[in-house]
């Protein structure tokens, strides 16, 4: 670990490493150091680790966790340390859990939703698929900013026509094309965005099962309980479009932003 970083807290740990909260000498800011232990990794796992750092370096957007630096260490074990800004408001998964079944106001959902869309818009313009969009990877700042993070399995494509093939992601958020081992593109992120939107509207998953085979069946059927009618028909329509079985029928991020602006205008007209 670099001498100028002072570790203040262990934030979490996984199979390949740990995440620490740290401060830097003569700075007011807090940082997260994701330390990935590379001893025992396969070549593919090492490539994925370097890939996360490489993608973070390419990204500069207010709604994406800001990259500070990356450095390697050889003692006591070979490790790669990825340093990013710290989100002081927790994550969206924690926020949904803390809401304790009290419905989010539609304006709050739209605020979160549009900021996630802006982050995805930046990614998709660079032909990057996040591939693990979920509440635990959407970080909140006390200022109200929403920041997309954790690019451990993100995939950079060479062109907008190229598709990814690897089956990766969190099961409940997997799109039908990934479940069925078909090539996929940025529209797979739109599906995951729809799952997250449904969570914010209902506090549950649209497709739930105790095993991956059963979950796959439910995702392929595409049948889910409708969200509460307290939310506008326009918001429910956005959800329906995001969860289209056919990726070609899902809106692009650009089109989603148009839907959002129309919905925002409607709310302003009603409340004025």
Model-inferred region functions:
Residues 18:
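Conserved N-lobe ATP-binding subsite of Hanks-type protein kinase domains
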Residues 49, 53-54:
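Regulatory alphaC helix of protein kinase catalytic domains
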Residues 66-77:
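Short beta-strand micro-motifs within the conserved protein kinase catalytic domain, predominantly
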Residues 75-85, 93-94:
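A conserved loop-to-beta-strand element in the N-lobe of protein kinase catalytic cores
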Residues 112-113:
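Activation segment signature within eukaryotic-like protein kinase domains
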Residues 189:
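Conserved catalytic-loop aspartate of Hanks-type protein kinases
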């Amino acid at each position: 670990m670099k001498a100028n970083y002072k570790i203040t807290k262990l934030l979490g740990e996984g199979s390949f490493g740990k995440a620490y909260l740290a401060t830097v000498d003569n700075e007011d800011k807090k940082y997260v150091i994701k330390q990935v232990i590379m001893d025992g990794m396969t070549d593919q796992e090492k490539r994925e680790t370097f890939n996360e750092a490489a993608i973070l370096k390419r990204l500069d957007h207010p709604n994406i966790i800001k990259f500070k630096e990356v450095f390697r260490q050889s003692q006591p074990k070979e490790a790669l340390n990825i340093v990013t800004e710290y989100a002081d408001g927790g994550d969206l998964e924690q926020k949904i859990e803390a809401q304790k079944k009290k419905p989010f106001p539609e304006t709050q959902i739209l605020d979160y939703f549009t900021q996630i869309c802006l982050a995805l818009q930046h990614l998709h313009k660079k032909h990057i698929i996040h591939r693990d969009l979920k509440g635990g990877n959407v970080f909140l700042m006390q200022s109200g900013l929403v920041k997309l993070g954790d690019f451990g399995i993100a995939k950079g494509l060479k062109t907008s026509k190229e598709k990814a093939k690897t089956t990766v992601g969190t099961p409940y958020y997997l799109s039908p094309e990934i479940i069925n081992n078909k090539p996929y593109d940025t529209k797979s992120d739109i599906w995951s965005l729809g799952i997250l939107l449904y969570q914010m509207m209902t506090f549950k998953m649209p497709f739930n099962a105790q095993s991956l085979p059963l979950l796959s069946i439910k995702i392929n059927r595409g049948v889910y309980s409708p969200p509460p009618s307290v939310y506008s028909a326009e918001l429910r329509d956005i959800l329906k479009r995001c969860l289209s079985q056919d990726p070609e029928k899902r809106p692009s991020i650009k089109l989603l932003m148009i839907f959002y602006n129309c919905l925002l205008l409607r709310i302003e007209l009603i409340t004025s």
